[in-house]
Structures are given as C-alpha cells and as structure tokens.
Design a protein with these regions (language model features):
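Acidic, Ser/Thr/Pro-rich low-complexity intrinsically disordered segments
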Residues: 1-11, 23, 27-28, 32-161
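Short amphipathic
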Residues: 19-21
Length: 161
C-alpha cells in the first residue's frame, strides 16, 4: 500500500470498528500540506509526531452527520498519531501529500506537556468531523510518531448525536 491509496471503510450503524497495522502503510517525506493555511491540520512544530508510516482510510460522511474517530494502539506504550480531513470526493489530487486544501482537518498526537483538564493515554481521538448540508468524504491517517513503521491498532468511527 502506498501513502496515496486510502482503503475504503463502509460505515455501519452507530459505530464502525476496523483493525490495521502501520506496516501496511508507507513513510511520507513531505508533510508541508499539514501546516499549509489551506489545511491547518497540525503545526510544523509538531511534525515529529507524524514522521512514521502513514496508513490511510476513507469513508462517506452523509449530510447532517457528525463522527468521532478513535485510534487505539494494541500496545499501550506505542506512540501513534491520528488525523482526519474532509473533501468533496477523494482523488489522487486531494490525498496527502498532494492535499492543497480541504474543508476541515483535525489531528491528535501525544502531548509534549500536560494540559490542564486533559488526561492522555495511548488512545488518540479526533472530534468535530461533520457535514451539515453537503455530504463529504473523510480521509483518516493513522501515523507512527518518531519514525515508527509498525504496530497493530484498532480504529473506531462513532456517530455523534
């Protein structure tokens, strides 16, 4: 699997779960798409959290739907990161690293320092992925931090009421 070939996920019901492995992905040397003002996914100062293998997925987000995406590494000591972005329709031209702009991009990674009111464990959660009037497609990136190239994980996509 190359980094620009996301795997389709069919959402079923209120919650969809899949399993994966970082070894199924590939490194992404150009991360500048992430801190471009047209995407604003994560700042360049946080790029070390996204330097490992990237495994990409995508799914259809119907109108008037909001989802929360949770990444759960099998190894509680593994350092993984997560991002998700919305586009009209997934194509080679808007799949990272070729992403020039998107509707919304959110990311989560291990925090460099403690944040008041937030306890962090090995899980990563991306919120606020939503469609109002228009449906979108959402690309999910599961990434190893610090160059990590392997490790099993589970992804959970849950509809938010």
């Amino acid at each position: 699997m190359t980094t620009n070939t996301p795997t389709y996920i069919e959402l079923s019901g209120e919650e969809t779960k899949i399993s994966g492995n970082l070894a199924e992905g590939a490194p992404m040397t150009d991360l500048s798409w992430a801190w471009s003002s047209s995407n604003a996914c994560f700042p360049e100062t946080q790029k070390e959290h996204f330097t490992g293998y990237h495994v990409l997925y995508y799914f259809d987000l119907p109108s008037y739907t909001e989802v929360e995406i949770e990444l759960i590494p099998d190894d509680v000591d593994a350092d993984f990161s997560l991002y998700a972005y919305e586009v009209g329709q997934v194509s080679e031209n808007n799949t990272v690293p070729n992403l020039s702009s998107c509707v919304r991009c959110e990311a989560d990674h291990k925090q460099d320092r403690k944040i008041r009111g937030r306890t962090q464990d090995h899980r990563r959660i991306v919120k606020d992925i939503l469609a109002i009037r228009n449906p979108y497609q959402v690309v999910i990136g599961v990434v190893g931090a610090q160059g990590r190239a392997g490790g099993k994980f589970k992804l959970k996509i849950k509809r938010v009421e």
